[in-house]
Amino acid sequence: MNHARSAVRLAVATASIALAVSSLGWVPAASASATAAPQIGAIGALPMVKKVKTKITKQPKSATIGRYGTRTSATFTVKAKGTKLRYRWQYQLTGTTTWTSIARATKKSYKAKAADWSAGAKFRVVVKGKKGTAKSKAATLTVLYPTNTPAADAMAQFGLTGITQGIDLSAWQYGISMPSITSWVGGDGFVMLRNGSGSRPINTSFVNPCTKANTTTGSTPITKDCAYAGLADATTNAGRRLGHYWFNGWIAPMDSTPAQSFAGGYTPEQSATQFVTWLLSDGNYTTASTDPLVLDIESGSAWTKTIDGKTKTLKLRAWTSPEALAFLNTVRQQLTSQGYHANLYVYMGANNASSMSNGTYVWTDVAAITRLWVASWGTDNGRIPTALPKTGPWPTWSIWQYTDNARVAGTGVGGLDADIAQADAWTPKS
């Protein structure tokens, strides 16, 4: 046999088979050994990689987010098929026709943040593969900004009537431009003010937010809101309605230390007496007033004290229904006995307002004598949420704090607590 001639025939045959396979769009995977002699019988067993045409199989979807709040970003995602795909996201701003690549946006998804993009920006992705390039459809990013007309928005959205709008303030907003506030709330609007707070334990040092001076709570766990008087005067002088609230605080039932080192033996009734004293001494509340008088029922911070050489930490909890009733009944008794009205309220979150125990609403007894100022923020984007708040045993809310992200131009501050009120919110509960 002529071995040289046989080797040539074998080489020609191998090359012919390889050419045939290649013409079908298949290429053999890398050989385990570049020097191994070709084996005809092994060709059919070699793994093959097919080049797939680049194609978008799922388009990115448009999204709506808020400039502020809990939903301030959106993730655009694309699905594609093909071989060795590469991604490049692009944007197009409103009013332009140019697509511009986004630096480092080279994955299947792109996260767009409200702080980085203007409302109406469009996004697409260009996908490149071994067999072509595909462009996705454009997805639009809608960015919602806080509203300046929450009362009108709520009436249109929920079919309500007589709704007014307001802002609630405390010493944390000391120095705020009140003309800007009173202009924003409108002629029939309102301002809710913190009268005082029991949030700090006794003998606790803190910095006065109005004067920036170091001070202490002393022997009682309460502090008068240092901005209350000035803000109340400005609101009254502008002809806007007022509301007044007391932040629940340290009282004897929540202090587990033997010497009452946190609460100092203070009671809800004593808190109510102090609230009324500061309310009447301010001068803006008269016998003709029907202002909401609110007990703010919320938990507070954890505080640490050294007692007899040992460290003790307690967290300020929200008051219970019996504690709230003790405060509210004392306020009512003291005011009505002096010829004043008592338009009693409680403030709390919607989940707390609707909490239940053994099949009964926790706040049923409180709801019998008060109206409800409820906090329900949705995504907290400075706009009226898409759903009305839960109210538990109250038939409805009287005042609704819908956000802490209201933006009022000219105030010199950022986000503010904003509210809307029903038409009868300044009418005492019968």
Question: Could you say what each language-model-derived stretch is?
Answer:
Residues P150-Q338:
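Substrate-binding cleft of extracellular glycoside hydrolase catalytic domains
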